[in-house]
Amino acid sequence: GCGGVDSYDLDMTVDGRGSKGALHLYNKFHMEHPSNMFVLEYASRPPLAKIFYEDVLMSAVFYGYPILIENNKYGIARHFESRGYDGYLMARPDHLKSANTKINVKTKGIPSNSQDVIQAHAHAIEAYVHNHVGINRETGEVGRMYFNKTLEDWIGFDINNRTKFDLTISAGLALLA
């Protein structure tokens, strides 16, 4: 399995609202275990970003899943590194590397402002919904998506205004991972 995180770096925002941090963990295909399904949804904004980072770290360690982060918000990466768990942070997946991607990039995660990544993210969710949510009309199989908040987030998702859609961002990152 693997995970995706939509993180934040500031403890509090000016207006006190701010977006939540979000984490999804996903079981990839496996012959013996439930696969192609999300197994964890977490969305919260604790008073300190460090608390969110630690919650994500504990989830990654408990499940043994590496996670994909947005590399423009690096507080979570610093937290994992300071605790000695940077091995749980994924590098940019090969299928998301473009010709412009440097070969030896040391930064973990992927850029959330890259148009290639934004498009791949939207396509990953679209494909997942088509193949694993509801009834697959071609096979007759019933998909398993147990997290209603994520489903609602997907319904309202606006690719041109992604700020409010924390669950969509983290779920998409998990699928890209």
Model-inferred region functions:
Residues 1-92, 131-177:
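RNase H-like, metal-dependent nuclease domains and their acidic two-metal-ion catalytic environment used
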Residues 89-134:
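Short alpha-helix plus adjacent loop in nuclease-associated cores
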